Amino acid sequence: MAETNRIQMIVFDWAGTTVDYGSSAPSEVFDRVFSQAGIHLTREEINRPMGMEKKAHIRELLSTPSGTEQWKARYGTTWTEEDVQKLYQTFEATLHDVVAEYSVPIPGVVETVRSLREQGLKIGSTTGYTSQMMEQVLPRASELGYEADCVVTPDITGASRPTPFMLYECMRRMNVYPPSTVVKVGDTVVDIQEGKNAGAWSVGILTGSNLLGLTQAEYEAMTPEELERRKQKAAERYMDAGADLVIDSIRDLPAAVSEINRRMAEKEAAAC
């Protein structure tokens, strides 16, 4: 019989959550690919759809007012699915060459995941990367001390975030149910939506996140006042997306899980 009154599994995102501080790899590759095509987007525009399957991300970038206008000005017509496919092929090839370099665990990840496992929690993961991309990420992350018990990519389920199907596949593989005993942890709006659409708990991370949009060097050089302002803005976006909790860094996750377990116990007691 499944345990229903405590968290059984944590499902992490990858880039910006457990590896690749600031989710720099996809952001920099999108910038490079679009610049080569003559389309110049801001970092904020590039990062906004982050967490989606990468071909869907390209469509979102082309659909921005800036992307649409620049494409028409440069090519004299609106973009097509053929254009999306060409951009995606370039993106995939470019990312494949560099993604292993960006697969270093974010500070605090290795120790925190070890602590969670010692508490008996299973560690799942979902990502906007394809299986082929993850073949470059997994060995490097493992070499540096981070592994998930299962890794689910959009090409496996045929659907990406914010749909819940990758998270459901994690649950199926790890034999964990109901969804209310799962916590989704991520660094983008679609991570939060994935968890809520699955009926799980959703937790947003600030430090190292795509939503905060800072490299580690930028984070460390920023004034405390400006950093706090940016964190507050990112936290509001998480909460607007339905986050149950927002934490400063992954080191705060064990305490967040304890808080969720407390809420679950209170709810069960109230129902008795």
Residue ranges and their predicted role:
Residues 49, 126-128:
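Structural motif
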Residues 17, 127, 207:
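Ser/Thr-centric signal marking residues that sit
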Residues 4-110, 114-119, 135:
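N-terminal helical cap/lid subdomain that shapes the substrate entry/recognition surface
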Residues 1-8, 110, 114-115, 130-272:
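Asp-based, Mg2+/Mn2+-dependent phosphohydrolase catalytic module
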